[in-house]
């Protein structure tokens, strides 16, 4: 409801013009920098491999399979198994996606990854929930 105030006519007249003061928020840009573990690179020029030394951060398991799979692929796998069925619910009017999400409602995303998630085969990761250091690493690079 608060954001409706930006469209409220009395707040967009004369010198006030509230809506004109809104600045876009951009999560990423090719001209921005990524900086982690004392390594800084341009967003559009990230070298392959492990440029940010994730292997130094992921200590509670062998980091190599997780680094090879990558943050984006792992998070897409974690979230996609809910997002895709929910989108199908919107198209079909069914509740299968919602029912799946409610099955895990007791979890936050973090606890789901740590306690209930099993990676898909194509990621070539161990068939068990994610270790804490991997979750910390994923959260650092999400967005």
Curated annotation (Swiss-Prot):
GO terms for molecular function: L-amino-acid oxidase activity; toxin activity. Ascorbic acid inhibits the cytotoxic effect caused by toxophallin. The mechanisms of such inhibition could be based on inactivating the H(2)O(2) that appears as a result of the amine oxidase reaction and is toxic for cells. Its cofactor is FAD. Keywords: FAD, Flavoprotein, Oxidoreductase, Toxin. Belongs to the flavin monoamine oxidase family. Cytotoxic L-amino acid oxidase with high oxidase activity towards DL-methionine and L-methionine, L-phenylalanine, DL-norleucine, L-isoleucine, L-arginine, L-tyrosine, and DL-leucine. Shows relatively low activity towards DL-lysine and L-lysine, DL-asparagine, DL-valine, L-histidine, DL-threonine, DL-tryptophan, and L-glutamic acid; and no activity towards L-cysteine, L-glycine, L-proline, L-oxyproline, DL-serine, and DL-aspartic acid. Does not use benzylamine, ethanolamine, diethylamine, meta- and para-phenylendiamine, ortho-, meta- and para-aminophenols, or putrescin as a substrate. This is Cytotoxic L-amino-acid oxidase. The keyword Lipid biosynthesis does not apply. Its EC number is 1.4.3.2. It catalyses: an L-alpha-amino acid + O2 + H2O = a 2-oxocarboxylate + H2O2 + NH4(+).
